[in-house]
Amino acid sequence: MPGSTDALEPRRPYEVFEHTADVGLHAFGRTLSELFIHAAQGMESLMVAPEQVRVQVSREITVTGHDEVSLLIAWLNELIVLFDTEYLLLRQFEIDEISGTYLKGRASGEPYDAQRHDIGSAIKAVTWHEAAVELTDEGYKVRIIFDI
């Protein structure tokens, strides 16, 4: 499988940072697939602690973009739409196919349950402000800011 969440590198897969009335994330991955998975994990962790979410349902996601940044923003915004429309909290992410302009993958989790889930930040959207995907000696790195 092109991307999985089984073996994480020693470095944390993502780091949260504060940004004037919003919140940001640096995510890291050895591959583009791993970067997108870690960015999704980081974003979802802002909404709910991952250990509170069971893997009960899965949704296939296909998005396109004109480059890696727009593709990542489309991927993350599609995950936000799943919460906004189906109240799905997500925990597990898989990338089946990815290029610089196309992604096909899956996101799995469960519907929000007020009895079990403590919601943190409500994310409205991923912003374009300062969004950048960078290839480094260690792999990929992204900086993204969320409108909360």
Where are these regions (language model features)?
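N-terminal intrinsically disordered, cationic/polar leader segments
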Residues: 2-148
